[in-house]
Amino acid sequence: MTKKIIENDVNVSSPLGVGGGGRVIGIMQPYVFPYIGYFQLIKAVDKFVVYDDVAFINKGWINRNNILVNGKASMFTIPLVGASQNRLIRDIEVDNLAAWSKKFLKTIEQSYKKAPFYKEGFEIIEQVFSLPVASIAELATAGLKETCKYLGIKTEIVESSTIYNNQDLKSQGRILDICLQEKANHYINPIGGMAIYDKQLFADSEILLNFIKAKPIQYKQFNKDEASFVPWLSIIDLLMFCSAEELNEHLDKFELV
């Protein structure tokens, strides 16, 4: 079957840009300062559900990502207490966040202090890591909300654990139930879910299912030539090198499949 591509200039508030004002939902596990594709999903929907009451993913992106250090991708990892795939994300606490964040903020300062939007970006990061949060889910959600506030993204962000009461359901059945509870008629999922989600299942409930695919983006880092550009880093990198206006332009560079 041929894939249908919907370019990002379509009105995503209405399925396929045709008529009506539908409600668009996105759902994703909480990641701390994730890459730009995560924020593209948030911006593309009316309501974004932080999927915090599902199993933790070991060696995933919930508590780690990459920033630019000396011209190369360098991974940061937030320490956790008792992280296990047998526990829910919302139940996993951060281990001594104050001490870790002090070192991390120093790394950010050393790595980005000459970036054009260092002041604005650093204030966001510092604000998030100073909040009195206990769990990695709370920390990640705070990061999403503060970044969206800075970028002027008005999408409503909620945690799945606070609303839906459907932990007896699994996989796409649970996602579908959230869409139904929200009376959504359009669900957008990250591109990585194409192999496990069934468009017909959603269509049977009169819900359009699309997958969001980020287009390649490039912006000026410290490097002077395009060949040394380091792509797909944490949103932290874009906050340092791009104005809010430019970053929003990059957020619109996607297609729906």
Language-model regions: role of each:
Residues 2-9, 22-257:
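Residues lining hydrophobic/aromatic ligand-binding pockets adjacent to catalytic sites
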Residues 10-14:
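N-terminal low-complexity segments that are often proline-rich with Ser/Thr-Pro
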Residues 16-21:
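Glycine-biased, low-complexity coil/linker segments
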